[in-house]
Amino acid sequence: MLYDAAVYDRTLTAGSYWETTVDLAEINYPALTQDKTCDVAIIGGGITGLSAALHLARDYGIQSCILEAGALTWGASGRNGGFCCVGAAALGRDRLLKKFGQSETRRYYQAQREGTELVKQLAAEESIQIDAQGDGEIEIAYRGDRWHDLVADYEFLTKVADYPCKLWSPKDLTEQVYPNSRAHGALYTGVSFGLNPIKYTLGLAKAANQHGAAIYPHSPVESWKKDGNWHMLQTAGGQLKAKTVIVATNGYTEDRLHPRLGDRLLPLLSSIITTRPLTSAELKAQGWQTETPIHENHNILFYYRLLKDGRLLFGSRGGTMGDRAENERRRCWMAQALGEKFPAWRDVDITHSWNGLVCASATLTPHVGRLAADESVFYGFAYHGSGVSTGTWSGRTLAQLVAGQTQISDLPAVFRQSLKKFPLPALRVWYLRATFALSDLLKLSL
């Protein structure tokens, strides 16, 4: 394990605000308790796995069984900030263009937009209440060079990717978002929105199950063997047998799961706090104007959005340990950062604090594909913090691949890079600790 055992303890709930918006006791999918055979086994019952199961069953009549290690929504699907947005590659625009060229970079951005649209489409088609908010995403620049980057992003997104975008001056920010004397400006991108991720995930599960997919939570894969053309996935309660496997475990992928997948991913802790509901007078005191999700163009990322009941959700990078003491330090640090950023809310109570794992890859790109050594094994993960939309799109794409409706070569090149091992993988988190320590020392977040 790269982090403290508490990060992986599936008997502990996240303690998130989202958990208070649903009745978790009503989620009654059983664990696997006997041997089963199915067409497709899906390891991971988050957004990617559920989207794959739904599309396999509904669109292609293919039976699948999902093995989820914890309770439904225990992982990132129930812990994220509910940003249905683009940005699944950690490579910036210039690096994407240099590596993949304009045509493939455009295809990547088109796929990202399709992902956000697919979430809304599924919510409408399957009657999923997702508590959608906002009509885009706002990126704020705090330095002159970052503002110039946003201007270049605007030129590319509008002229090449065909995104609806606007550049906002500090005056525009004051009138449409909130007064921010330090900001150089912002980029508004009109393809994103906010939602309640736990409601969305449970809605996907209900829809997938109603269309014929079987869902088995509390059923971690203890061993994975191959017998001829059959994959044998052993859990504590029984064995699942399938000729095709989809791995959709993202930041919670265990290195031991499959030798061709181990040491290829880097889970990163991300932390979130929420305030009590803010009154209309408190919102007015801060000059707050929007429900559209916001993130900042900092070395240290801050992201935030106003929720349906008036709470402010405020997120940032997590720690590098994940133990109780560090979590409390992160909560205090984030509460202080929130108060410094929004002085009118400096003394507002923090009601919820939690963290979860974001997934990065060695290539800094998302990955959707199949193993060259065993083409009956498919995978989708490494969304770099944009898993709501990209996980949904990846799940549909994986279903299309399994059903033979598309080929790997048809995917945007950004998604089909070969999986690469991290050098000295046991030191992955130590690299991260050194990077964060240097960043804090040099105060690069300013």
What are these regions (language model features)?
Residues 82, 117, 125-133, 221-223, ...:
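Active-site substrate-recognition segment that forms the wall
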Residues 1-40, 58-59:
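Extreme N-terminal leader/targeting segments of oxidoreductases
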Residues 391-411:
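Internal hydrophobic alpha-helix adjacent to the cofactor/substrate pocket in enzyme cavities
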Residues 2-15, 21, 90-97, 120-203:
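Flavin (FAD/FMN) cofactor-binding and adjacent substrate-gating region
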Residues 80-110:
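Glycine-rich active-site loop/strand segments that organize a redox cofactor
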Residues 38-66:
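N-terminal Rossmann-like FAD-binding beta1-loop-alpha1 element of flavoenzymes
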Residues 363-366, 370-373, 378, 408-446:
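Helix-rich C-terminal "cap"/substrate-channel and partner-interaction subdomain
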Residues 156-158, 183-243:
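Helical element adjacent to the flavin cofactor pocket in flavoenzyme catalytic cores
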